[in-house]
Amino acid sequence: MKKSRIYLLLLVVFLNPSYAQEDSYTSTVLAPGYNQLTFDAPVPGSYTLASYKPASNGNVIDADGLNKSLHDIYDDKIVLLNFMYSTCADVNGCPLATAVFHKIKNILDKDPVIGKQVSMISLSFDPENDSPDVMKLYGDGTDSGSVDWKFLTTNSVKDLD
């Protein structure tokens, strides 16, 4: 009986997250706006936003391996487009952009009427490593039924010009 109590105690200790060691490779997120701001944000309407324009067209490959035009994928929706590559290890680069997209998607999922008007596109600019199969794996679990999030790649960087 005493032995089983010791095993139970060890099990509780090892499974309790408060006893877990922190990863030795933690990184500081340096991108402004991701964490709490260290300054007061400007009052809405007190500044001018940059002009946005449509992204250039290009030849892309969807996660099913089908060749498409980037503009054909827009599907007359509001498009949020980020450029990434699956092997990016810079915490303030692609992983941060993907985390921000997840946050946006979670917000849009709460309002399907708006969510269905938005198309999110993560486009790899590393065709050598990011095949359609890799992009499909990268996008697994992002389909919510309301927000359309596509993971695309291309045959070459030249195809994006």
Predicted feature residues:
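Structural microenvironment flanking redox-active thiols in thiol-disulfide oxidoreductases
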Residues: 96-161
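Extracytoplasmic/periplasmic, Sec-exported soluble proteins
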Residues: 50-52, 62, 71-73, 89-96, ...
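Short, flexible, glycine/charge-rich loop motifs used to bind or transfer phosphoryl groups or to couple energy/partner
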Residues: 48, 69-71, 110-111, 142
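Extracytoplasmic
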Residues: 53-55, 73-80, 115-118, 130, ...
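N-terminal targeting signals for export/organelle localization
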Residues: 1-57, 61
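Short active-site neighborhood of thiol/selenol oxidoreductases, capturing the structured segment around
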Residues: 69-100, 120-121
